[in-house]
A protein has these predicted regions:
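Aromatic- and glycine-rich beta-strand/loop motifs that create alpha-glucan
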Residues: 1-26
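Hydrophobic alpha-helical transmembrane segments of multi-pass membrane transport/permease proteins
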Residues: 20-42, 58-60, 166, 170-177, ...
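Long, hydrophobic alpha-helical segments
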Residues: 52-68
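Transmembrane helix boundary and interhelical loop/hinge segments in multi-pass membrane proteins
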Residues: 65-85, 99
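Junction motif at the cytosolic side of a transmembrane helix
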Residues: 206-222
Length: 222
């Protein structure tokens, strides 16, 4: 079972490496969106610090959503998705592997570059660690939730818009508690409550989302 999971993750990561432009698009989108706000809001440090948590999280959310179309569409187009559904292991395990690969390709680079981007918002140095931890908890959850929407729209023309409508309402709790953790840390308050809720949501998503995504894939491919 673990060997199958490893094969799926390595396969998707290798395919993504061959399509470097797609991977870079997500990262550049995050950097550009987050960098436009300081240019438009002016150099006021207090305003930048106050707006930074929400801006960084919205940019990460939109960048994550931008890459959801690559989760299943390529495999559906070349017929390999149907072959993956025939493996003896549960389809939920296949979903977990693909979500892990998606996060390694799209989510982890955002997590690593976010503290650097946060410097232009004059965030306190102590808040950068909280930002990193919040994104480490929140971005996998974005991938898990997004996988459900991506599975429901496999093979649908214009599915990207439909995915956005499906997953954006479900992203709201992640946005609230992720930005809240960074804001609490920046203002000298305790961010552990927000981080604990993010961790609980991630655990819940890890348990439920793969099965929901597997069911959505079966419905879409029937």
């Amino acid at each position: 079972m673990m060997r199958t999971l490893g094969h799926i993750v390595s396969r998707d990561v290798l395919l993504a490496i061959r399509r470097r432009a797609d991977v870079a698009t997500t990262l550049f989108f995050f950097v550009i969106v987050a960098s436009l706000f300081p240019l438009g809001m002016g150099p006021d440090p207090k305003l930048l610090r106050a707006m930074a948590p929400g801006i960084l999280w919205v940019a990460a959310l939109l960048a994550s959503m931008l890459s959801l179309g690559r989760l299943f569409d390529a495999d559906y187009a070349d017929g390999s998705l149907e072959q993956l559904m025939l493996v003896p292991e549960p389809l939920a395990l296949v979903v977990i592997g693909k979500v892990m690969a998606h996060w390694l390709i799209s989510g982890l680079p955002l997590v690593l570059i976010a503290p650097v981007i946060a410097l232009q918002f004059d965030l306190p140095a102590g808040s950068l660690g909280t930002l990193l931890l919040a994104l480490l908890l929140g971005t996998p959850l974005l991938s898990l939730i997004g996988a459900i929407g991506a599975a429901l729209t496999v093979g649908v023309r214009g599915g990207g818009v439909l995915v956005s409508l499906l997953v954006l309402p479900l992203y709201v709790p992640v946005l609230i508690f992720g930005a809240g953790a960074v804001d609490a840390s920046a203002t000298g308050m305790d961010a552990s409550g927000h981080l604990s809720i993010l961790g609980a949501l991630l655990l819940l998503g890890m348990v439920l989302a793969p099965w929901a995504t597997a069911a959505a894939l079966r419905i879409s491919l029937e």
